């Protein structure tokens, strides 16, 4: 079994967790998140602690137990991220590097000049918030860690950093190792 799942997830006082046969709901001050319940995993709430254990009663063979135990760590982390999301939220910061490269927000569209002959328009999903505090900085935030990361990756994909010059869209904490150019 996953070592991290041997510890319980501690629920803050302002977070409610409800479990049905088909889904897990976590409700907090920032919103509500849902997760499909997996038959391999058993989730128990005891007071303000959530325990995630393998549901070995469903296992038909000894080989299945390994898969079940692997899912425990995954579900422990998913539920923990849901709890963190509805209390604190998640944030990814992107930086635009390059002469003439910039971004601006118009309504729910992110409009970027990235060196193409046309402007790039990116529709911002309703469950994610995008801010542009400066023309070369984009902040993506929300309560669902997977959605925040995916939207940030989709924005970055429009102009990934050039391995020679470093121009493009990069994460603020990303370290680029630039390649050396040709030598004459």
UniProtKB/Swiss-Prot annotation:
Origin superkingdom: Bacteria
Give the SUPFAM superfamilies listed for this entry: Ribosomal protein L6
What's a single GO MF annotation on this record?
Answer: structural constituent of ribosome
Q: Which GO terms describe its biological process?
A: cytoplasmic translation
Keywords (A to Z) from UniProt: Ribonucleoprotein, Ribosomal protein, RNA-binding, rRNA-binding
**InterPro entries from the entry?**
Ribosomal_uL6-like (IPR000702), Ribosomal_uL6-like_a/b-dom_sf (IPR036789), Ribosomal_uL6_a/b-dom (IPR020040), Ribosomal_uL6_bac-type (IPR019906)
The family assignment reads: Belongs to the universal ribosomal protein uL6 family.
* Assembly notes: Part of the 50S ribosomal subunit.
Name recorded for this polypeptide: Large ribosomal subunit protein uL6
Q: Can you name the source organism?
A: Fervidobacterium nodosum (strain ATCC 35602 / DSM 5306 / Rt17-B1)
Q: Gene name on record?
A: rplF
